[in-house]
Amino acid sequence: MGKEKTHVNVVVIGHVDSGKSTTTGHLIYKCGGIDKRTIEKFEKEAAELGKGSFKYAWVLDKLKAERERGITIDIALWKFETPKYHVTVIDAPGHRDFIKNMITGTSQADCAILIIAGGTGEFEAGISKDGQTREHALLAYTLGVKQLIVAVNKMDSVKWDKNRFEEIIKETSNFVKKVGYNPKTVPFVPISGWNGDNMIEPSTNCPWYKGWEKETKSGKVTGKTLLEAIDAIEPPTRPTDKPLRLPLQDVYKIGGIGTVPVGRVETGIIKAGMVVTFAPAGVTTEVKSVEMHHEQLAEGVPGDNVGFNVKNVSVKEIRRGNVCGDSKNDPPKGCDSFNAQVIVLNHPGQISAGYSPVLDCHTAHIACKFDTLVEKIDRRTGKKLEENPKFVKSGDAAIVKMVPTKPMCVEAFTDYPPLGRFAVRDMRQTVAVGVIKSVEKSDKAGKVTKAAQKAAKK
């Protein structure tokens, strides 16, 4: 077996018709978690439906359809392997909750793969001014996805024309630079997701293509295929050395055991014997045991979805959206207000002070008031454009002072990224996204259980 491969998460972005599904489907099909039986079943169905030219998008369409019908399909189907990594494809966009998922997301992407359609006219449509592509790329960058790979798809439709590829690289470099990425760190790979050129094996259709290269801290890295570009992602550092932050997804009451909060460790570690504080509830108690998939764990680390048993705390005292942390190491606290950089994505009107939509931040879902519009800024550079604007509208970015209508626990993005980004939901869609700059924390004394006092004496 050797050493376990590192896990990385990628998010696939691009225009609706760029061939995202086909390309992702191809990788999953060739290197991935779909077993032969499932594929044979799909192939048979495809043939019966006269889709005999069965291609990879079909795989993905099946998975998506099952997902949207609420059948939670085995997420292993969205995984594939490279020599170095286990790769999980996080919800590709197009899904209406994509933006919300990406922010509150079960997982932060380590790298974004931008798929551009190389076909005549298609490329231009994909990254035009109003393009969704721009929105998704900007989101990825704003939300801290610092690595990017660009795949120029459908190169077969332009007969593998070298000049076309170079023209697209030039345009796309400008595009990703405007978003905030440095094009020198981005591999550009010409592919055909349909035929498989340069996906896993180097293609023979483009003798002119010498391969991609990118600059990293440790020097230049080169390769030919999309799979190699994914394999060359810089390994993510998982924040185990930070203080514990664990947003609760649910709290269960289990007969004979007691209260069991469940959630995903975002930073730090949790283990039995620790004295933890829940914010904004203000409850401090001892962790009796930690488990994952019904097995006892010595410790839960970032990325683990754990359940843990706490003493002397009733189910009524803590709830989804609370955050658990180490009482002795920067314990989490509720907040009175926070300042955030907010980007308005699609709001039909104007947003002015007093607007109170619902914020989704980690697992919390709470109405917050836009208390003061402090300044309007340039989305890319962050430079101030206007002091105290009267309102902001779609496309604008602003620094806003936000006041939660109920107690909530958030953090500055620079300290704890997963607790410092949020989606603003209104009219059943994501109208804005934000990154928290600073937090005004509330200091209120809370309840310390007997178990916590006892543990403290040890």
Curated annotation (Swiss-Prot):
Pfam families from the UniProt entry: GTP-eEF1A_C, GTP_EFTU, GTP_EFTU_D2
UniProt modified residues of type N6,N6-dimethyllysine: K3, K316
BP GO terms, sorted: biological process involved in interaction with host; translation; translational elongation
G3, as annotated region: 91-94
Molecular-function annotations in GO: GTP binding; GTPase activity; translation elongation factor activity
N6-methyllysine PTM sites in chain numbering: K3, K30, K316, K390
Subcellular location: Cytoplasm
Domain tr-type G: residue ranges: 5-240
Assigned GO CC terms: cell surface; cytoplasm; fungal-type cell wall; hyphal cell wall; yeast-form cell wall
NCBIfam families named in the record: EF-1_alpha, PRK12317.1
Record-given protein name: Elongation factor 1-alpha 2
UniProt source species: Candida albicans (strain SC5314 / ATCC MYA-2876) (Yeast)
Lineage, opening ranks: Eukaryota, Fungi, Dikarya, Ascomycota, Saccharomycotina
The encoding gene: TEF2
